[in-house]
Amino acid sequence: MATSTIQQSAFAGQTLLKPQNELVRKVGGNGGRVSMRRTIKSAPESIWYGPDRPKYLGPFSEQTPSYLTGEFPGDYGWDTAGLSADPETFAKNRELEVIHCRWAMLGALGCVFPELLAKNGVKFGEAVWFKAGSQIFQEGGLDYLGNPNLVHAQSILAIWACQVVLMGAVEGYRVGGGPLGEGLDQLYPGGAFDPLGLAEDPEAF
């Protein structure tokens, strides 16, 4: 009886361990990479979404327009100019704001990066971003990367032309579809740059 119980226990232990051993075997064959997914609450369940979300004046807010349903981030029920009344206009404005935020994040990186380079031996006329503009009034002026052979910042027209050409080319490339082809969301195309696999789960993304 004891022997039978021990054998059954051992068999049960092997059964319980089998999935784990199978997982270990598969992980070992895939270089130790495990794809894990978890369920994340959707945005409408948050207090910041839906009809009961906080309003811009709290309890003193006026009647919220019917087209502001709390579906999108930042919707506090305020649209006196009616900019979100037309769905197509709202979609276009939302696209522009997302792009503006991305340019702003890139600009924030551009504020910090020159200081990091300056601390590691790269010479700038002025690496601190809020002081760099004053260099335009100095005798030597302001050059990109401190190199006079590059675009000279004394010429406002040259700066303007560079901004229009460089940023306009990138934006035109994005609006035209870029390398991703058609049928993808222009704001969140996914797949182009996702080394951490953060967009693999549509619900989590």
From Swiss-Prot:
Topology versus the membrane: Multi-pass membrane protein
Keyword terms, alphabetized: Acetylation, Chlorophyll, Chloroplast, Chromophore, Magnesium, Membrane, Metal-binding, Phosphoprotein, Photosynthesis, Photosystem I, Photosystem II, Plastid, Thylakoid, Transit peptide, Transmembrane, Transmembrane helix
Free-text remark on how the cofactor is bound: Binds at least 14 chlorophylls (8 Chl-a and 6 Chl-b) and carotenoids such as lutein and neoxanthin.
Residues that bind chlorophyll b 2: R102, V151, L180
GO biological process per UniProt: photosynthesis, light harvesting
Post-translational modification Phosphothreonine, affected residues: T39
UniProt feature coiled coil, ranges: none
Gene3D superfamilies: Chlorophyll a/b binding protein domain
Main location as per UniProt: plastid
Binding positions for chlorophyll a 2 per the UniProt entry: H100
Localization annotation: Plastid, Chloroplast thylakoid membrane
Gene Ontology cellular-component terms listed: chloroplast thylakoid membrane; photosystem I; photosystem II
GO MF term (any one): metal ion binding
Binding of chlorophyll b 3, residues: S155, E171
Database matches in InterPro entries: Chloro_AB-bd_pln (IPR001344), Chloroa_b-bind (IPR022796)
Entry-annotated residues carrying N2-acetylarginine: R37
Residues noted as binding chlorophyll b 1 in the record, renumbered to the chain: Y56
Post-translational modifications: Photoregulated by reversible phosphorylation of its threonine residues.
Positions contributing to chlorophyll b 5 binding: Q163
Residues of the transit peptide: 1-36
Segments passing through the bilayer: 98-117, 150-170
A matching Pfam family: Chloroa_b-bind
Oligomer and partners: The LHC complex consists of chlorophyll a-b binding proteins.
Domain remarks in the Swiss-Prot or TrEMBL record: The N-terminus of the protein extends into the stroma where it is involved with adhesion of granal membranes and post-translational modifications; both are believed to mediate the distribution of excitation energy between photosystems I and II.
Reported function: The light-harvesting complex (LHC) functions as a light receptor, it captures and delivers excitation energy to photosystems with which it is closely associated.
Protein name: Chlorophyll a-b binding protein, chloroplastic
